[in-house]
């Protein structure tokens, strides 16, 4: 069921739609939010492409059940993966180098997604040596990032799940990181209204 993934994609689309018109104290703060939205959308479409292949590509947010396009058709898997690559590149371009978050997107997290993506493209989608080179470039960028280092004490890897070796993590433990929960990326069903559950809007034309 890809409902949660598309709910998250819709949230990212709305962020990308409205954030550019909001006044921020700094351009970096705005770009960080936009980069996170691109990263999350890439993350979701990457899963969708690998699990379902052909799938709808939605880039405009839905705000009403009266909008056009509520029953999108599936696009070829190749187009889905192309969208993933574009979103990853946009996220990397916008993400300020100073960001070192481990429970949100950062250049390190985006590069690891990029590496995973290009390895998949090389091995499964037969994208050729260029994809392998792109994966290697992304990995090297993370290895050369001073925000990450090996823990001196092996136990610290498990004691602090947002420690020096961690590039990206979801925080589950209470007070480990205030407000941290996986709903930032996948919306749990308990947060969906009863009306939506009882009368869901179909996502794909194949349903």
Protein language model regions, located:
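Short linear capping/connector segments at secondary-structure termini
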Residues: 60-68
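Conserved, well-structured interaction surfaces
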Residues: 1-52, 75-82, 88-102
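Second-shell loop/turn segments in exported
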Residues: 2, 67-75, 126-127
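Short strand->helix junction
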Residues: 23, 66, 98, 124-125
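Short, hydrophobic secondary-structure boundary micro-motifs
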Residues: 25, 57-61, 150-153
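Short coil/turn linking the two alpha-helices of tandem helical-hairpin repeats
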Residues: 49-56, 99-100, 120-129
């Amino acid at each position: 069921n890809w409902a949660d993934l598309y709910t998250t994609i819709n949230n990212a689309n709305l962020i990308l739609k409205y954030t550019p018109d909001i006044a921020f104290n700094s351009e970096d703060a705005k770009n960080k939010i936009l980069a996170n939205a691109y990263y999350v959308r890439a993350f979701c479409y990457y899963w969708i492409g690998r699990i379902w292949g052909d799938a709808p590509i939605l880039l405009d947010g839905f705000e009403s059940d009266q909008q056009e396009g509520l029953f999108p058709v599936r696009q070829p898997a190749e187009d889905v993966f192309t969208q993933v690559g574009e979103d990853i590149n946009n996220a990397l371009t916008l993400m300020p180098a100073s960001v070192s978050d481990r429970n949100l997107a950062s250049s390190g997290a985006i590069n690891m997604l990029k590496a995973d993506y290009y390895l998949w493209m090389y091995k499964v989608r037969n994208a050729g040596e260029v994809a392998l080179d792109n994966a290697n470039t992304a990995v090297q960028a993370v290895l050369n990032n001073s925000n990450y280092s090996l823990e001196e004490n092996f136990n610290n890897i498990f004691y602090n799940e947002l420690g020096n070796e961690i590039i990206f993590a979801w925080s589950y433990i209470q007070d480990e990181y205030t407000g941290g929960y996986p709903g930032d990326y996948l919306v749990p069903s308990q947060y969906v209204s009863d009306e939506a559950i009882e009368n869901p809007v179909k996502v794909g034309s194949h349903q």
